[in-house]
Amino acid sequence: MRIVNAADPFSINDLGCGYGALLDYLDARGFKTDYTGIDVSPEMVRAAALRFEGRANADFICAARIDREADYSVASGIFNVRLKSLDTEWCAHIEATLDMLNAASRRGFSFNCLTSYSDASKMRDDLYYADPCALFDLCKRRYSKSVALLHDYGLYEFTILVRKAS
């Protein structure tokens, strides 16, 4: 979790939380968090709530929007499957979601996307491959001067970290 300061307790919104894998990751590394998982799938939210039943400082909500401000917000994997959406429609969806992540985050947010630098022979029509440079530019212009683009790990994806001024 390169977006957070691990030394201090923090609150976090996990948009597209699925069954709560990020909370497992945070717990395994000893992070002290107030966690809210948000997902559009009622089945995933139920599964996550059952997995973490009785756990303090962990809530799971079935929704498409974040309605709570936190120190950080993350979105992992939610921009990959576009089904039959046109590029223009999907780009507008991504931008609206980034606006929401920004509004819901006091200290910063992060997200990942499949990269347009993927091997053409492995690309699928139902997936969206974003231009990392375009999204980096958008984040620098719209959200913060402190933006990092991570495109140096073994997957055909990239991560953008947006840190807000303290």
From Swiss-Prot:
Disruption phenotype: Grows normally in liquid culture, traffics into host (human and mouse) acidified compartments early after phagocytosis, suggesting it no longer arrests phagosome maturation as well as wild-type, impaired growth in mouse macrophages. Decreased synthesis of 2,3-di-O-acyltrehaloses (DAT) and increased synthesis of sulfoglycolipids (SGL). Decreased colonization of mouse lung but not spleen 42 days after infection. InterPro entries: Methyltransf_25, SAM-dependent_MTases_sf. Keywords: Lipid biosynthesis, Lipid metabolism, Methyltransferase, Transferase. It is an enzyme of class 2 (transferase). Pfam families: Methyltransf_25. Signal peptide: none annotated. One of its GO terms (molecular function) is methyltransferase activity. GO terms for biological process: glycolipid biosynthetic process; methylation; symbiont-mediated suppression of host innate immune response. The keyword Transferase applies. Belongs to the methyltransferase superfamily. Probably plays a role in host phagosome maturation arrest, as well as a role in the synthesis of acyltrehalose-containing glycolipids. This is Putative methyltransferase Rv1506c. It comes from Mycobacterium tuberculosis (strain ATCC 25618 / H37Rv).
